[in-house]
Curated annotation (Swiss-Prot):
Annotated protein name in UniProt: Chaperone SurA
GO cellular component annotations of the record: outer membrane-bounded periplasmic space
A biological process from GO: Gram-negative-bacterium-type cell outer membrane assembly
Main location: periplasm
PANTHER family: CHAPERONE SURA
E.C. numbers: 5.2.1.8
Cleaved signal peptide residues: 1-13
């Protein structure tokens, strides 16, 4: 009898349908359950915006493409030894809750109310942090803006007119590959014009962005947040300044394809004098690499910290060990810095470290740091603030363009086999 029951169970188990794979991505796979879960999350986000919710089938290609790009970046992070500790993750969750005026417990309750798992949300935040660190290493660190570019921008009509003006925007991107033929470019132009015509007739922007846009933020309804006009491709600056809130721009050709923008909100600065708190700080940066993993990097930073505590010279150790090319030869000295120009983790530790004291080793997207605060001051920084503002605008503009190019590149270079029924096959 027992044998019959076991056999019956085996037969029953054998006929259970296996979970299907919707894409093979280099050395990993994407399961249908992952895609379905993300589709549900996107539908909930769109519904909260008060827009018509597209059917799952209309969202699946966009969601799958997003999952493929995320997977490729996570694999890069794995190969590079990028990790996010539970402590870092807890801090990030706390920050997200705080931004939404909630405690962590209230945040958990809000997720449950929306039918979302707290553990799933934690893992999604972990993945996003890893992806952010991958992009920091592969994209952001390559971007250079010269002092001459900053001066030229500040002296230009565009810089003078647009630097203080900000726009809350959403976008739709109809992408064109770098090697696109004239026929492909023409087809993209026709598609963009068709979408624009629909929008002018009252079609829902959020829904169209989620189902047609190639932009990275498509599944968020194309929401780009607040942008300086000068961060945007040149055709849009003057257009947005004169445009009423709620209107959309005609499609404009950019290096990445044809873009349509919707103006959600608008605000402008007053150009008043600005006082700024500055900190004189020096640091030593140790980066993980393919030959030194995260734990080994942390241990090296701790050894350097101990040597400084035992009386060795900070500047000499920075010259010997620091992997920050901009400060190592200066003994790690970053000079006087605006805390707001630094990544949040570095800024927080610096602000909490008393003047004349050393921080314990801590981690940012760049690697492991030890810092020393040498001084604090408040200064009239109107000119410097404008220069920093211009630098950020130019850097962000270059970053946006470089990121899209890099994402297309890693997608083109990867082996991707689409197994979603009815989807375009894109195996390489």
């Amino acid at each position: 009898m027992l044998g019959a029951l076991l056999l019956s169970g085996a037969v029953h188990a054998a006929v259970q349908p296996l979970e299907s794979v919707v894409a093979i991505v280099d050395n990993d796979v994407i399961m249908k359950s992952q895609m379905d879960q993300r589709v549900r999350e996107v539908q909930q986000t769109i519904a909260k915006r008060g827009s018509g919710v597209p059917p799952a089938e209309a969202l699946q290609p966009q969601v799958l493409d997003r999952l493929i790009l995320e997977n490729l970046q996570l694999q890069m992070g794995e190969r590079s030894g990028i990790r996010v500790s539970d402590n870092e993750l807890n801090q990030a969750i706390g920050t997200i809750a705080q931004r939404n005026n909630m405690s962590v417990e209230q945040f958990r309750a809000a997720l449950a109310h929306d039918g979302l798992s707290y553990n799933d949300a934690r893992e999604q935040v972990r993945r996003e942090m890893i992806i952010s660190r991958v992009r920091q290493r592969r994209v952001a660190e390559r971007i250079q803006v010269s002092q001459q570019e900053v001066k030229n921008f500040l002296a230009s009509d565009q810089g003078k007119a647009q630097l203080s003006e900000e726009f809350h925007l959403a976008n739709i991107l109809i992408a064109t590959p770098d090697s696109a033929s004239s026929d492909a470019i023409q087809a993209a132009a026709v598609k963009a014009k068709g979408i624009y015509d629909q929008l002018k007739k009252g079609a829902d922007f959020t829904r169209l962005a989620a189902t047609t846009s190639s932009s990275e933020n498509a599944l968020e309804g194309g929401d780009m947040g607040w942008r300086k006009a000068a961060q945007l491709p040149p055709p849009f600056g003057d257009m947005l300044s004169a445009m009423p809130v709620g209107d959309v721009t005609p499609p404009a050709r950019t290096p990445g394809g044809f873009i349509i923008l919707k103006l959600l909100e608008k605000r402008g600065g007053q150009g008043q004098a600005q006082m700024r708190d500055e900190v004189h700080v020096r640091h030593i940066l140790i980066k993980p690499s393919e030959i030194r993993n995260e734990e080994e990097t942390k241990r090296l930073a701790e050894k350097i910290y101990d040597r400084i505590q035992n009386g060795e010279d900070f500047a000499e150790l920075a010259k010997s060990f620091s992997e920050d090319p901009g400060s190592a030869l200066n003994g790690g000295d970053l000079n006087w810095v605006d805390p707001n120009s630094l990544v949040p983790e570095f800024r927080q530790v610096m602000n909490e470290t008393p003047q004349g004291e050393l921080s314990k080793p801590f981690k940012t997207a760049y690697g492991w740091h030890v810092l020393e605060v040498l001084g604090r001051r408040s200064t009239d920084a109107t000119d410097q603030a404008r220069e920093q503002q211009a630098l950020n605008v130019l850097r962000n503009r270059k970053y946006d363009e470089e990121l899209q190019t890099w994402l297309r590149q890693i997608r083109d270079e990867a082996y991707v086999e689409i197994k979603l029924p009815g989807a375009t096959q894109a195996a390489q």
